[in-house]
A protein has these predicted regions:
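Acidic, glycine-enriched catalytic cores built around paired aspartates
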Residues: 1-58, 94-96, 272-432
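Short, basic, helix/turn surface patches
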Residues: 73-77, 153, 157, 228-234, ...
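Catalytic alpha/beta active-site cores
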Residues: 1-185, 189, 193-194, 199-205, ...
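A generic "cationic amphipathic patch" detector
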Residues: 57, 112, 128, 136, ...
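Electropositive, surface-exposed helix/loop patches at the edges of structured domains
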Residues: 84, 88, 231-253, 311-338
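Long alpha-helical, hydrophobic tracts
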Residues: 141, 158-293
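Small-side-chain structural scaffolding
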Residues: 115, 120, 189, 263-267, ...
Length: 432
């Protein structure tokens, strides 16, 4: 996986990636082989089932046995723990492309052990994603403990000549201004670097405003390097991936091809190696292997169209956006470090309690939920409510001015209905 991304970085190529999971090993292999050939894939995905993610292996075994008996899928992915190392190895050796496990869990230690031993060379021990999004009650300390284990295991592999790549995107990000997500991504990678992780893929969430999306990616990578260097981690290799809008997708398949195009264009503009796409039929039904292959091939052709071109954004607007976002991220990170007196975990725990790290759409009840985002007139995400974020007046004023401009153009005040419409806009085939 690392070598593949290095090649993409050198050649300025963009590799599509997407989750794909079947209940039985035979179906999983068939799917991967089909997408690799018919979709012209460069990377393949593997989605473990939700029972495996919850460590309920007995229930996963019952589902697997029922599927094998009836021929009907009863799980929403591959039960990797129940199948074990030899089966994962068989799957990996059945295709030429690297297979990327794509899932989140508060405790994925056993799954990741099996996946690594079976030949997978990538995973996503994403501390804040798995804290915010995947459990209502799990503590940050527990998630950090399990993810430190995975990070140390990845470091062990790297020390012995097997480079493994860790991905993180902080939280799903839809409807939330990017600086908060950037801060959590950087904190996640610092915690992993402490355990010896040497290769990371910075995941970015595109909202559709190309200036903000490009700036956010650049700020995220630059500040990650800066804070890693500041803390003594000078040898971490950084790759970049992006996904466009993690909210509801259009039901109409034709509109979803435009979403795939947008994802690929964003990848080109930010210099990403990986484009996290969702299949064109995903909002309508469970995607077939043909749906997945068509999606991959679409992304491949779009990549071919833009690869040789030099595309740049208007510099003055991008510079101002970068200046403001960098200031926001530093405000959050410096407060976390202050809370912990240099200890990231202590600082993060106190920051969550104080609402300095926040998420309005978190499943976890520990979130203050005071921060709210809204789109401005050009589709960039602005802070409607900054909650307890440690922002200066000029930052708050900047966002309020952008929101006021949208209100002026619309002729009405922003309200809760506006927020909901923003979250659903892509599913309707519009940005704002």
């Amino acid at each position: 996986f690392v070598n593949k991304l290095r090649y993409a970085k050198e050649k300025k190529e963009i590799y599509a990636s997407s989750g794909m999971g079947k209940t039985t090993l035979e179906e999983q292999i068939e799917l991967l082989q089909y997408v690799e050939k018919e979709g012209q894939a460069d990377l393949l995905g593997l989605s473990p089932d939700s029972l495996t993610r919850q460590n309920d292996y007995e229930a996963a075994q019952r589902g697997l046995e029922e599927s094998l008996k009836t021929g009907k899928a009863t799980l929403n992915g591959l039960p990797v723990v129940n199948y074990g190392v030899s089966a994962i190895r068989k799957m990996i050796e059945s295709v030429a492309c690297p297979v990327q496990p794509r899932y989140g869990a508060a405790d994925a230690r056993l799954s990741d052990e099996i996946l690594f031993a079976g030949g997978c060379s990538n995973t996503s021990p994403d501390v804040f994603m798995d804290f915010w999004q995947h459990s209502a009650r799990v503590s940050l300390e527990k998630v950090v403990e399990t993810h430190q284990y995975v990070g140390r295991l990845m470091g062990y592999y790297s020390e012995h000549g097997v480079p493994l790549c860790a991905g993180a995107q902080g939280f799903y990000g839809a409807g939330i201004p990017p600086s908060l997500q950037t801060a959590t991504v950087i904190l996640s990678f610092i915690l992993l670097a402490e355990q010896g992780v040497k290769h990371v893929c910075v995941k970015c969430t595109g909202h559709g405003n190309l200036v903000q999306d490009v700036v956010s990616s650049n700020v995220r990578c630059n500040l990650l390097k800066e804070y890693l260097n500041k803390l003594g981690y000078h040898d971490v290799e950084i790759f970049v991936g992006i996904s466009f809008s993690l909210m509801q997708y259009p039901v109409e398949i034709g509109a979803n091809f435009a979403v795939v195009f947008m994802n690929t264009l964003m990848s080109k503009l930010i210099g990403a190696q990986m484009s996290d796409i969702r299949t064109v039929a995903e909002a309508k039904a469970i995607p077939t292997k043909e749906d997945i292959a068509n999606t991959f091939r679409t992304a491949k052709v779009m990549q071919n169209f833009v690869q040789a071109q030099k595309i740049e954004l208007e510099k003055e607007e991008a510079d101002l956006e970068a200046q403001m976002e960098e200031k926001e991220v530093r405000s959050i990170l410096d407060k976390v470090l202050e809370f912990g007196d240099g200890d990231i975990l202590v600082g993060a725990a106190k920051a969550i309690e104080a609402g300095v790290l926040d998420n309005p759409f978190a499943a976890n009840r520990a979130a203050a939920g005071k921060v709210l985002g809204i789109k401005d007139s050009e589709g960039a995400i602005r802070y409607l409510n900054t909650g307890n974020l440690p922002f200066s007046k000029d930052i708050i004023d900047y966002h309020q001015e952008k929101i006021a401009l949208r209100e002026s153009k619309q002729g009405n005040k922003i309200n809760y209905e506006t927020l909901v419409n923003d979250l659903l806009s892509v599913s309707k085939g519009i940005l704002v």
